[in-house]
Amino acid sequence: MGASQKNQELIGGLILFSAALLAIVVNNSPLASYYAMLETINVKLGIENLVIDKNLMHWINDGLMAIYFLYIGLEIKREIIVGTLSKPSNIITPAIAAFAGLAMPSLIYLSINHDIKVINGWAIPSATDIAFTLGILALLGTRVPAKLKLLVITIAIFDDIAAIAIIAIFYTKSLSLLSLSLGTLFILAMIICNRIFKINRSSVYVVLGFFAWFCTIKSGVHATLAGFTTALCIPFRENDKDSPANFMEDSLHPWIIYFILPVFAFANAGISFSGISFSILFEPITLGIIWGLFVGKQLGIFSILAVFKKLKWFKLGESFSNLQLYGISLLCGIGFTMSLFIGVLAFNDTHLLNAIKIGVVVGSVLSGFFGYIVLRFIVTNPS
């Protein structure tokens, strides 16, 4: 990771945090009525009977986040072909650690929340916000070796793959087979353009991907799946910086960290304290998310990394201390944007959403703070 990219990750993390803080301030000020317009102003896209009519909040969650998952898909494709995921030995331990880091928070959430009305939120504390995590890693600088950062990114990649699967399987509320079939045809068209006709023009995949996204929204399946599958269809050529996948990933990166994720954070993090008492911190859904992110994530990930290192099944881990592995396990509990995203898919009740936002913010802050403390002040020999 070059110096300029480190600076981008650091600045991006600070902007993301500022956007979330601004949302809370605005939604608890005289400007709150303007903030509410995110859910009252509708925008239409389409012609005649082929129209998508959604409010600004939905456009951010269905549109901008689809672009974010397109970017995630491009990153994953590159890592599979030429990166860390191209070697099976580098895949097994981070994949199992990511799964444990998904399962443990979900189990903690379900152990606290028994009401059928809130069980649907089990996946909220299972996510990791890679943008925030990379921002803290950039802040730590040389205190975190490059290989350790690579391990965090690899775990986060598997976390993202799991999040996409969870959203597609568990948070699809209705299904139009016709629209889904049409979306699949556009995906197949991209595969044909790539594999058979060897078309390298990015614009072709942008247009076909847009129609795949449009049909996916109409089908009822969440649009993030269209973004991810589109990325997998875009040509990637090894040692060719101008291949469509490389070009699009490089082009999207600044938009993701400086615009898309901050806008999402601003739109979704606006906790309104009006009518909320301190007791909301102790509601089961809030506690389930806090303990899931802060305890479940670190417990699931660190237990796998430490055990596999002890058994010598994790060669990369032999160069790290247990404290370093524990520190990054803590950082993986920063759920923030991804947890908020799953939360707004799971519920639409205002009180529940406020409880979710508080739980996500508290759990993420605890994870980020203590992860930073461990890696910055407690680890004695970072190299």
UniProtKB/Swiss-Prot annotation:
Stretches that traverse the bilayer: 10-30, 56-76, 91-111, 121-141, 150-170, 174-194, 206-226, 254-274, 289-308, 327-347, 355-375
Listed InterPro entries: Na/H_antiporter_dom_sf, NhaA
Name listed for the protein in its UniProt record: Na(+)/H(+) antiporter NhaA
GO molecular function: sodium:proton antiporter activity
Coiled coil regions, renumbered to chain: none
Gene: nhaA
Keyword check for Nucleotidyltransferase: no
GO CC annotation: plasma membrane
Species: Francisella tularensis subsp. tularensis (strain SCHU S4 / Schu 4)
UniProtKB keywords: Antiport, Cell inner membrane, Cell membrane, Ion transport, Membrane, Sodium, Sodium transport, Transmembrane, Transmembrane helix, Transport
GO BP annotations, alphabetical order: regulation of pH
Family of this protein: Belongs to the NhaA Na(+)/H(+) (TC 2.A.33) antiporter family.
Function of the protein: Na(+)/H(+) antiporter that extrudes sodium in exchange for external protons.
